[in-house]
Amino acid sequence: METQRASLSLGRWSLWLLLLGLALPSASAQALSYREAVLRAVDQLNEKSSEANLYRLLELDPPPKEDDENPNIPKPVSFRVKETVCPRTSQQSPEQCDFKENGLLKECVGTVTLDQVGSNFDITCAVPQSVGGLRSLGRKILRAWKKYGPIIVPIIRIG
C-alpha cells in the first residue's frame, strides 16, 4: 500500500514537471523579436493607410541597449519604409512586393511591445525633409563658381 502511494505521488510529480516543461516554452514563444514587432507595426500602418500602395520595411535602426526583457514594456523604434508596387487593396504581404522606383520614403519613430498576444505600437511616419534642395543649391553654387570663379578671383586679388 505504501509503495502504491509513493508510486502515485511520483507519478503526480512527474506529471507536474511535464506540464511545467510544456508551459515554459510557450511562455517564451510569446515574445516577438524586435524586427518581428516592427514588421507587425508596418502591417498595421498599411492596413490603416489611405494611400494607394503598400509600404515595406527598408531599413531598421538597431534596437536600444536595454536590460529589461519584459515584452510588455514599450521599446523605442526607428525605421524607414518605402512605397512598393503592390496596391494596398491586394492581399499580398509587403515583404513579397518590390520597391517602387522613385517610391515615397517615410521615416518612422515610436514604440512597440514585443508581446505576441497583445502587441501594441505607437508609430508616427513622416516624409523626411528633403536634403535634395541643399544638394541642388550646392550644385548651382559649384556651377556658378566654375563659370564665374575665373572672373571673380582676379578681381578679388586686384582689390
Curated annotation (Swiss-Prot):
The modification Pyrrolidone carboxylic acid is found at Q30. It is found in: Secreted. It comes from the Eukaryota. Keywords: Antibiotic, Antimicrobial, Disulfide bond, Pyrrolidone carboxylic acid, Secreted, Signal. GO terms for cellular component: extracellular space. The keyword RNA-binding does not apply. Its main location: secreted. Residues 30-131 form a propeptide. Residues 1-29 form the signal peptide. Disulfide bonds join C86-C97, C108-C125. Pfam families: Cathelicidins. One of its GO terms (biological process) is innate immune response. GO terms for molecular function: lipopolysaccharide binding. The keyword Translocase does not apply. Belongs to the cathelicidin family. Exerts a potent antimicrobial activity against Gram-negative and Gram-positive bacteria, including methicillin-resistant Staphylococcus aureus, and fungi. This is Cathelicidin-5. It comes from Bos taurus (Bovine).
